[in-house]
Curated annotation (Swiss-Prot):
PANTHER family: SUA5, THREONYLCARBAMOYL-AMP SYNTHASE. Its main location: cytoplasm. This is Threonylcarbamoyl-AMP synthase. InterPro entries: DHBP_synth_RibB-like_a/b_dom, Sua5-like_dom, TC-AMP_synthase, TC-AMP_synthase_SUA5. Belongs to the SUA5 family. TsaC subfamily. Its EC number is 2.7.7.87. It catalyses: L-threonine + hydrogencarbonate + ATP = L-threonylcarbamoyladenylate + diphosphate + H2O. Required for the formation of a threonylcarbamoyl group on adenosine at position 37 (t(6)A37) in tRNAs that read codons beginning with adenine. Catalyzes the conversion of L-threonine, HCO(3)(-)/CO(2) and ATP to give threonylcarbamoyl-AMP (TC-AMP) as the acyladenylate intermediate, with the release of diphosphate.
Length: 184
């Protein structure tokens, strides 16, 4: 039995948590709460300029961040078409999206994620999640809840569930050019 309700409560309280994704555990929080995102960046020692990935099981949870006016029906079809591998899409960001999410860019990286844990967390919280690999600087990304506890301590909030078992992290691509920023 996992600890889903506790992790949902932590997210609603704007805390950083660890949860399983396609290949590794991710560190996530409420992207709408600046203090939560800044806590994540500090924990990860990640520069704000890099920006963050947002994931959700539905397009609707990601729409508040995406500038829809710059996308055509063909772009949406590409984004919503299921793929053998997970793909994070770099898309135009709405002007109101804070820099702590976009970094130095006018884009936002988003991914539709159908991992049961992510579906449960997003449905119960009502928001998308930030997603960055769960590891301390210089360490390998965590692939199990036990590895998260070893790196971050026994009391760190981690969802007791499994990743989808993929070997590689999701690919990162530009929605307009299909340019691959990170091979999956």
């Amino acid at each position: 039995m996992n600890n889903l309700e506790n992790i949902v409560e932590q997210l609603k309280r704007n805390r950083v948590v660890a949860y399983p994704t396609e290949a590794v555990f991710g560190l996530g929080c409420n992207p709408n709460n600046e203090s939560a995102v800044r806590a994540l960046l500090k924990l990860k020692k990640r520069p704000e300029e890099k920006g963050l990935i947002l994931i959700a099981p539905t397009k609707e949870l990601l729409l508040p961040y995406i500038d829809e006016n710059k996308l055509t029906a063909a772009h949406w079809q590409i984004f919503e078409t299921p793929s053998e591998r997970a793909i994070t899409w770099v898309m135009p960001a709405k002007k109101a999206v804070p820099q702590y999410l976009t970094g130095q860019f006018d884009t936002i990286a988003v991914r539709l994620c159908c991992i049961p844990a992510v579906i449960d967390l997003c449905e119960r919280t009502g928001f998308a999640l930030t997603s960055t690999s769960c590891n301390l600087t210089g360490q390998e990304p965590c692939r199990t809840a036990d590895e998260v506890k070893l790196q971050f301590g026994a009391d760190f909030p981690v969802l007791e569930a499994e990743t989808a078992g993929k070997t590689n992290p999701p690919e990162i691509r530009d929605i307009f050019t299909q340019h691959i920023f990170r091979q999956g």
